[in-house]
Amino acid sequence: MDDAGERMRDFWDDRAREDAFHFVDPRETFGQPDEERFWRRGAQEVDALLELLDLTLLKSDHVLELGCGLGRLTRVLAQRAQHVTAIDVSPEMLMLAQDHNDGLYNVEWVLGDGETLAGVEDASVDVVISHSVFTHIPSPKVQLGYVTEFGRVLKPGGWAAFTLSTDPGAHKAKPPAAPPAGSSRRGFLRALVGQAPTGKDQPEWVGSWVPLDALGATATQAGLFLERIEGSSTRRTLVRALRED
């Protein structure tokens, strides 16, 4: 693992300790997650992703999920597929995921290196899913490297569904500000004492975007055909890619 991978691991380990539920789904109130709603939204997001990209999971599928976090989507995928390989860069997230999903006997939890799918054999999976993960990766090069890896691990005829940002204006960190006055100052002070989220000004949260032409060129080199792209030029671009024979 290089320095970039180490930084991502350290960042997401810190966020897992701080409030894993909020950082996996920022709609959850920091420090006060509604766990039932959190898991329900995971199922809804799997359904929405598959519906928008016109995809269907088969009970015989071996699914690889990149960036599983707490296993919010993993839980649903495990119910619908034969086997799930759930990968995350953060050992803290993986530990929590296993604690919250200890009944998922068809899931293999794997610690990733933040850059590759090392350890996953060539042409060994039917489906790759990665949702709201690339958006937080600071390097477009790393994102495109993962696309190349998708082409390597997918069986011919297999498919990948993933989200990434194609909006260059969506990844600008706000500069550090002086302690504000009034109610904003109270929020600033809450962050100082651990009552508000931290780290959202760091590159590992701010993330980066990928030009569509670079995505297309990388996919072609990896043996992937980009069958469908929804939401181009936005922070939430959905991609369906087919592994060609």
Regions found by a protein language model. Give the residues of each.
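A short acidic, Gly/Pro-enriched loop at the edge of an enzyme's catalytic core
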Residues: G119-V128
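A short SAM/SAH-binding and catalytic strip from SAM-dependent methyltransferases
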Residues: V127-K141
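Class I (Rossmann-like) S-adenosyl-L-methionine-dependent methyltransferase catalytic domain
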Residues: M1-L55, S60-H62, L66, L70-L77, ...
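A short glycine-rich, Lys/Arg-flanked "PGG" loop and its adjoining helix->strand segment in the class I
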Residues: L144-P156
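Generic recognition of short, well-ordered alpha-helical segments
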Residues: Q79, K141-G145
